[in-house]
Amino acid sequence: MPKIVVVGAVAGGATCASQIRRLDKESDIIIFEKDRDMSFANCALPYVIGEVVEDRKYALAYTPEKFYDRKQITVKTYHEVIAINDERQTVSVLNRKTNEQFEESYDKLILSPGASANSLGFESDITFTLRNLEDTDAIDQFIKANQVDKVLVVGAGYVSLEVLENLYERGLHPTLIHRSDKINKLMDADMNQPILDELDKREIPYRLNEEIDAINGNEITFKSGKVEHYDMIIEGVGTHPNSKFIESSNIKLDRKGFIPVNDKFETNVPNIYVIGDIATSHYRHVDLPASVPLAWGAHRAASIVAEQIAGNDTIEFKGFLGNNIVKFFDYTFASVGVKPNELKQFDYKMVEVTQGAHANYYPGNSPLHLRVYYDTSNRQILRAAAVGKEGADKRIDVLSMAMMNQLTVDELTEFEVAYAPPYSHPKDLINMIGYKAK
């Protein structure tokens, strides 16, 4: 009976183990998770903090006991894999509660350890990062125990923006700082202006090109020379892959600690697969490497690896499109395709349109800005971005499907929209992009 060991029990690892069990009722499957919880919804965490998700239990899909009862898969939390011996096909495991170490053998090894939040490195009792449900609980408990009012949010990526919005909606008073003027980097820089407008509208203070210089209790000294007092600091300054323990093996790592995989999510070492934030692959629509640490990729990889292990060796990953979206107060920001800083590798043209998300005479209309970049040599779409109060998600998902099927920008004129006045136009924004490109 084959023995499958999975490292990490969140989106990628738990999903992969579950899919294997669906296809294979006999294999012995064991998951090691270094933290307290398994199968929690990472993307729900800011909304748990904001009390939009009314009960944290809704963010926790399974406990180890429930997972075993349903699927006959053993999950050991507080068990950290600290080394891999791929020649003997074993992993070294640390029980974080007892400090005992032991070795576990495997026939197949699936690595899904995820990423950890970067820290600014200040010694302070008021600083927090947000990576898992334990962090969420700590933030929530600190807010309640200390009657927190003023919160400094450091960083302006999509998670920080979600956290800031949820703190505000909870009734707290957040301030945002970011070390450069480049916020929400997955979006075109000039399309991020509504973020600043939404902050101004709510009189939420923010400073770009600003950093913390020192923390002394609740007194924060900034690089600008300003000194301010805050009850709490939440750092959202990026992540790094949890790959240190992999250095003990023969698995190839890139210079940033990510693991290159093939289209079966195999590493360079036999019988070892990698899924989730730690894996790096390639784009689907262009010949460039891609690392897309988002939920869809982890779930897709989990299914492909499960199929491979269950015996379907014909299934392969065709690449990322990098589809992403974030809500910030009244606006939605979405994009798909290569990142803005990767466009310089192509000879491209850009076409854009701004018009109402639905028929102008129907109430509640608001502008939607849609932009498409296409390759001048074959006129295929390289990237698209959309910003608006409604309809951005629909347009980006349609363009994602167009890119998946290698449609040209001209073929967007043939897109048949589901039209009624509350939803769109007879000639939709996507059609208009195609016409303008001609």
Swiss-Prot record:
Cofactor binding note of this UniProt entry: Binds 1 FAD per subunit.
Binding site for NADP(+): 151-166
EC top class named in words: oxidoreductase
Binding site for substrate: T15, Q19, R22, S39, N42, K71, H299, K427
EC nos: 1.8.1.14
One Gene Ontology term of the molecular function aspect: protein disulfide isomerase activity
Disulfide-bonded cysteines: none
Domain notes for this protein: Contains 2 FAD binding domains and a single NADPH binding domain.
Function: Catalyzes specifically the NADPH-dependent reduction of coenzyme A disulfide.
Quaternary structure, from the entry: Homodimer.
Note: Reduction of disulfides occurs by a thiol-disulfide exchange reaction, but involves only a single catalytic cysteine residue that forms a stable mixed disulfide with CoA during catalysis.
Protein name, per record: Coenzyme A disulfide reductase
Organism field: Staphylococcus aureus (strain MRSA252)
